[in-house]
């Protein structure tokens, strides 16, 4: 079964071809960082226009790489939400139109579900159930995953998502967009820090998160410093240490409460070196299992959408009708 996957929820255009028998055949990605850098953040209108410009060439590229013709496709999966409504509409309209022209099913995929299943795409032996830590620019959640479509929300952020907190803190310290990754690199390169930041919401029960106060603490520390490059690096390290330890504490609680020792990390922040290292060390200590997608599949991509679509299609779940429905806000559980 051959499925074309289309990701256009925000500022990256991702396209891929997935085969139920051979796995991922090809994928391509266009990042819009250069487009949005001058504005200091993602501009929704520009994001939509970029998707329009790059979607067709990327589809042609992945089909050529996979040596597949359009009429060989069995289905087309597209991200239907959550995300920027204009960006979602570009991908969904294209997918629905092509599916109609080819007389094949279109599959509306939840963006977060695609992230949760990305690790399973590379490790088919990964069995349900498992606990998922979903950490990205727009989300920070702990989710119990019992099967495809069977999700229970254990904890959520009350304000900023992890990636959002990284980006905003970087901006407050004068690091240009996209600053979150730069902030993490500064933290990794810094050997030690004199600062000790709070671990938010770890002194109370529950699995919810809050990072807005940590962001404010970083800003106050920066303003009270001499604002040298060494100060920026030391504050970055203290900030990252606080975020990572907070996530670890919450993961420990989730694993203990669920009595599962299988953890999956999903989303763009899952590429963070410090987080990966800390989770691997802890999970080894409890003789558990932790799964990460490859770095290229942590951030938004078409491969995870194609894979999720293939799984859904094999279960007989396809879109009905030709109406294009996208959901900018769409809870997973």
UniProtKB/Swiss-Prot annotation:
One of its GO terms (biological process) is tRNA threonylcarbamoyladenosine modification. Substrate binds at residues 134-138, 167, 180, 272. It is found in: Cytoplasm. GO terms for molecular function: iron ion binding; N(6)-L-threonylcarbamoyladenine synthase activity. Fe cation binds at residues 111, 115, 300. GO terms for cellular component: cytoplasm. It comes from the Bacteria. Transmembrane segments: none annotated. InterPro entries: ATPase_NBD, Gcp-like_dom, KAE1/TsaD, Peptidase_M22_CS, TsaD. Binds 1 Fe(2+) ion per subunit. Its cofactor is Fe(2+). It catalyses: L-threonylcarbamoyladenylate + adenosine(37) in tRNA = N(6)-L-threonylcarbamoyladenosine(37) in tRNA + AMP + H(+). PROSITE patterns: GLYCOPROTEASE (PS01016). Keywords: Acyltransferase, Cytoplasm, Iron, Metal-binding, Transferase, tRNA processing. Its main location: cytoplasm. Belongs to the KAE1 / TsaD family. NCBIfam families: gcp_kae1 (TIGR00329), T6A_TsaD_YgjD (TIGR03723). Required for the formation of a threonylcarbamoyl group on adenosine at position 37 (t(6)A37) in tRNAs that read codons beginning with adenine. Is involved in the transfer of the threonylcarbamoyl moiety of threonylcarbamoyl-AMP (TC-AMP) to the N6 group of A37, together with TsaE and TsaB. TsaD likely plays a direct catalytic role in this reaction. PANTHER family: TRNA N6-ADENOSINE THREONYLCARBAMOYLTRANSFERASE, TRNA N6-ADENOSINE THREONYLCARBAMOYLTRANSFERASE, MITOCHONDRIAL. This is tRNA N6-adenosine threonylcarbamoyltransferase. It comes from Legionella pneumophila subsp. pneumophila (strain Philadelphia 1 / ATCC 33152 / DSM 7513). The gene is tsaD.
